[in-house]
A protein has these predicted regions:
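Active-site catalytic motif of lipid deacylating hydrolases and related acyltransferases
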Residues: 2-59
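Gly/Ala-rich beta-loop-alpha elbow adjacent to hydrolase catalytic centers
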Residues: 64-69, 73
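Flexible "cap/lid" loop of the alpha/beta hydrolase fold
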Residues: 82-83, 87-125, 163-166, 200
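Conserved serine/cysteine hydrolase catalytic core
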Residues: 157-204, 208-219
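Post-His helix in hydrolase/transferase enzymes
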Residues: 219-234
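Extracellular Ser/Thr-rich, low-complexity/disordered mucin-like segments
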Residues: 238-260
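C-terminal membrane-anchoring or membrane-association module
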Residues: 262-283
Length: 283
């Protein structure tokens, strides 16, 4: 039986190297593994990019997303018959029409709001935006508390930012409704509330495991993550069934003062308003 290709999609405040431990283990098992760069420029564009990348792969695919990457794969996989299973690791799993900021507001518990560092930027077309980083001094405690401080410091230095407006975008699809899904919940996650992760997994009828880990589970617990991917690749876990279309709980999109970046609930309209103003072209 041909083994599927495993595609690993990272989230915010990380890069593809966060999958190194997982990729190494899967390759030893004989899997073909690719970890494309997630642009982190907005949910619609990021999902379209990954969807296009998937078309370059022949044969079955196991598509894996960490954190914000979960929202990306849930849209990118829609309509692609090669994607046989989805794996969500400490991830967002929005329903169609659901924005990540509103979803996060329904399940408070993130401790990362105070760790954000907004950095304005200008696009080539003259429009402006705001990138979100995690402050280096707060990265360890907020994102990767179960890793050595020195390792977390390197991760903080090499993190990739996400555009703030990405977390006001509404998901265009929810592929977990039609594709069997697996999910990993980190019980010590300070980025995305474990309660939110459990809710999403239950809503998606996902085969779920819980790990005593921080938000950086792919780095701190690569064997547990790899084992879950193996289950998804082999179909081991018969209770993993796609959710029926329309069967998911219809959540209200709140009136949008909350913004979530990789699980960060940023309350108040100040930064959102600033981000919107910066997107307007100069006159």
């Amino acid at each position: 039986m041909t083994k599927p290709t495993v595609v690993l999609v990272h989230g915010a405040f990380a890069d593809a190297s966060s999958w190194n431990g997982v990729a190494e283990r899967l390759q030893r098992d004989g899997y073909s593994v690719v970890a494309p760069a997630n642009p982190l420029r907005g949910l619609a564009g990021d999902s379209a990019y990954i969807a296009s990348f998937l078309k370059s792969i022949q044969g079955p695919i196991v598509l894996v997303g960490h954190s914000y990457g979960g929202a990306v794969i849930s849209t990118a996989a829609a309509g692609n018959p090669q994607v046989k299973s989805l794996v969500f690791v400490n991830a967002f799993m929005p329903d169609k029409g659901e924005a990540l900021g509103a979803l996060g507001d329904r399940f408070p518990g993130s401790e990362l709001a105070a760790a954000l560092k907004p950095v304005p930027f200008r696009n080539a077309d003259g429009t402006n935006g705001t990138d979100l980083y995690l402050q280096a001094a707060k990265f360890h405690q907020a994102f990767a508390a179960d890793l050595p401080a020195a390792m977390a410091a390197v991760m903080a230095a090499t993190q990739r930012p996400i555009v703030a407006s990405a977390f006001m975008d509404k998901a265009a699809e929810a592929a977990w409704k039609t594709i069997p899904s697996w999910a990993l919940v980190s019980t010590r996650d300070k980025a995305i509330s474990p309660a939110l992760e459990r809710f999403e997994a239950q809503r998606a009828h996902a085969q779920t495991i819980e790990v005593d880990a921080s938000h950086a589970a792919p780095v701190s617990h690569p064997e547990a993550v790899t084992d879950l991917i193996r289950q998804a690749a082999t179909g081991d876990g018969s209770s993993a069934q796609p959710a029926l279309a329309g069967a998911g709980l219809n959540t209200q999109v709140l009136a949008g003062l909350g913004m979530l970046a990789g699980g960060i609930v940023l309350t108040g309209c100040g930064l959102i308003g600033a981000a919107r103003k910066r997107r307007e072209p100069r006159r």
